Amino acid sequence: MLFIFPLSLPWRPSCWKESCSTGQRQAGRSREDSVTPPPSSPWPTPPAGAMSTKQEARRDEGEARTRGQEAQLRDRAHLSQQRRLKQATQFLHKDSADLLPLDSLKRLGTSKDLQPRSVIQRRLVEGNPNWLQGEPPRMQDLIHGQESRRKTSRTEIPALLVNCKCQDQLLRVAVDTGTQYNRISAGCLSRLGLEKRVLKASAGDLAPGPPTQVEQLELQLGQETVVCSAQVVDAESPEFCLGLQTLLSLKCCIDLEHGVLRLKAPFSELPFLPLYQEPGQ
């Protein structure tokens, strides 16, 4: 018979603890190896501060672009407004003399010598007599011809004209409510042979010119015969001008809708003549 006796070995607790801790570490590494690591990104992850800086830069860039577009829109609107104002202040008609900023310039009918181009050209010539020396002869003749036609052009006359008779002669009478008394031209007075009825100026009056007034002037307006007086003037047109005093005494009515001068009943109506009718027509 074989007897086996266990050997008595001394107890070593530190070795056991080391073996246990070694086993635990190996088990932990095995568990860590079993866990799959997340896939790594190809680009490095930027820090949080860098991301906020880029967002602020993009925001600032967008705001700057928006402000630039708004400034462009304001500039376009300003230019468009200036263009509209410039177009509004332009001449509606190239011959509108009342829109031309020249001193003492009034609209005086449709005469070509009174239009802006002629007025400016005439003032340039009058202000600088040597201005035409360097111009061709044909241009000088043209400008001098315009000047001569201007000097011989007819005087503008009022628009409201009616026919009447005086001394059995036909006259063109202007209806002028802006004048208190009647007026007659010296040429018309001589043609009618009424110089004897003229009241001479007083001896103390040294003013040159024609006599002042003619009396007992019989004027036939339609069927109405009016005895009136008139002041003598140098102007040749109009030949005779009815003032406000005579118009009120006749109770005249100016009917522009029908183009007639209505006299008090039962007298007839006097039609107005065409505008700016030349003498003798």
UniProtKB/Swiss-Prot annotation:
SUPFAM superfamilies: Acid proteases (SSF50630). Residues 55-78 have a biased composition (Basic and acidic residues). Its main location: nucleus. GO terms for cellular component: cytoplasm; nucleus. One of its GO terms (biological process) is negative regulation of transcription by RNA polymerase II. Residues 18-85 are annotated as: Disordered. Keywords: Nucleus, Transcription, Transcription regulation. It holds the Pfam family Asp_protease. InterPro entries: NRIP_C (IPR033821), Peptidase_aspartic_DDI1-type (IPR019103), Peptidase_aspartic_dom_sf (IPR021109). It comes from the Eukaryota. Residues 36-47 have a biased composition (Pro residues). GO terms for molecular function: aspartic-type endopeptidase activity. A motif (LXXLL motif) lies at residues 244-248. It is found in: Nucleus. Down-regulates transcriptional activation by nuclear receptors such as NR1F2. Interacts with NR1F2, RARA and THRB in a ligand-dependent manner. This is Nuclear receptor-interacting protein 2.
